[in-house]
């Protein structure tokens, strides 16, 4: 049996793969624990959805690509985080560290390297983020979701593994989705997702044309924490800050989705053959990874993309109208998407590589 230290955080995308792997690891008799930040979204997700998994909070600092006085403060946080992670790893003595990226993962990877514990880094996006660019230098293996990512990373330690799809994704129950929302199967359902923190701009665009949109859809709106508009109470429109295990049931009744462009979410929509309008985070809020993702899937004919800089209630409505007009073509294009681009046995590969790395240590 193998003991795995999981890490990764900052966004849902940096946690969701770990959320699917940990229960499988435990069911197969392996041991698992989590190292994350003290206040990040990963702490809430892991402790609430996997209460049997020990969560170790460590100090962490944000990695910025621009000059800021905060960078100096965060250097000390990262150094403390390395010390925190070393204490945890020395106590738990895992066979392998599996990292999904995000700034909290860097101290863990560095601590593991100092203790000669092998690490595997998983990159979901088309191009590696800053945290993973640092982590790759100290990791034994890198797994990529996109085959094209291999152009940007060291070939000798990299494997294209495809997207990791949750086992329960296709097992959502429509009756539960309808019961939760109060909706009916007689009218299309639009799911709006603004990412881990929600999106004020997407929320505003949806609400400005709500009456018009409700003529075509029933709408499930995942607004983000603290962004539910309590003054809006209309039939066919439900709001949630965030959903957890209910998401599979909501996806089971979804006809069309408006979403940010995190790779994990896109692959899930693609697996379920849900036509999607992708509104990636702009360059003012990110390094452009979601823009790359959205352009990639749009080029494949799987989605349509709306640049956030062009987002308004009018452009959103127009983009959705065009998407609906061509929805059957998008679904047909998605049928060409094969299971070879997804992976259901990632845990087995992690275990296999962990044993090989242990032998080769």
Language model regions located:
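Active-site-proximal region of nucleotide-activated glycan assembly enzymes
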Residues: 3, 31, 52-54, 113-175
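An amphipathic, basic-hydrophobic alpha-helix
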Residues: 67-96
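Acidic donor-binding loop of glycosyltransferase active sites
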Residues: 94-96, 252-267, 274-275
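A short, well-ordered alpha-helix in the C-terminal region of glycosyltransferases
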Residues: 328-340
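C-terminal alpha-helical cap of glycosyltransferases
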Residues: 340-361
């Amino acid at each position: 049996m193998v003991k795995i230290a999981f890490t990764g955080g900052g966004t849902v995308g940096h946690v969701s793969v770990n959320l699917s792997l940990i229960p499988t690891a435990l069911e197969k008799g392996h041991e698992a624990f989590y190292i994350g930040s003290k206040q990040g979204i990963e702490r809430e997700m892991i402790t609430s959805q996997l209460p049997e998994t020990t969560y170790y909070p460590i100090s962490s600092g944000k990695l910025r690509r621009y000059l800021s006085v905060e960078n100096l403060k965060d250097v000390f946080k990262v150094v403390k985080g390395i010390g925190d992670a070393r204490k945890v790893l020395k106590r738990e003595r895992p066979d392998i560290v599996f990292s999904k990226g995000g700034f909290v993962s860097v101290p863990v990877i560095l601590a593991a390297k100092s203790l000669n514990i092998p690490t595997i880094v998983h990159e979901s996006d088309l191009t590696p983020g800053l945290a993973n660019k640092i982590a790759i230098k100290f990791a034994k293996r890198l797994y990529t979701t996109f085959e094209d990512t291999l152009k940007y990373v060291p070939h000798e330690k990299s494997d294209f593994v495809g997207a990791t799809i949750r086992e329960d994704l296709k097992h959502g129950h429509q009756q539960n989705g309808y019961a939760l929302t109060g909706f009916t199967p007689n009218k299309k359902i639009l799911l709006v997702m603004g990412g881990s923190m929600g999106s004020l701009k997407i929320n505003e665009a949806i609400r400005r044309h709500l009456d018009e949109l409700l003529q075509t859809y029933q709408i499930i709106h995942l607004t983000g924490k603290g962004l539910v508009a309590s003054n809006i109470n209309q039939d066919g429109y439900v709001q949630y800050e965030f959903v957890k295990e209910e998401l599979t049931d909501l996806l089971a009744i979804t006809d069309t989705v408006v979403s940010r462009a995190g790779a994990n979410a896109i692959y899930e929509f693609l697996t379920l053959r849900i036509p999607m309008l992708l509104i990636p985070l702009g360059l003012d809020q990110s390094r452009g990874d979601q823009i790359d993702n959205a352009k990639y899937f749009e080029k494949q004919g799987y989605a349509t993309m709306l640049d956030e800089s062009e987002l308004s209630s009018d452009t959103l409505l127009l983009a959705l109208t065009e998407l609906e007009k061509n929805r059957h073509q998008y679904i047909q294009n998605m049928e060409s998407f094969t299971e070879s681009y997804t992976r259901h046995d990632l845990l087995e590969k992690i275990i296999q590589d962990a044993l090989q790395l242990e032998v080769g240590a």
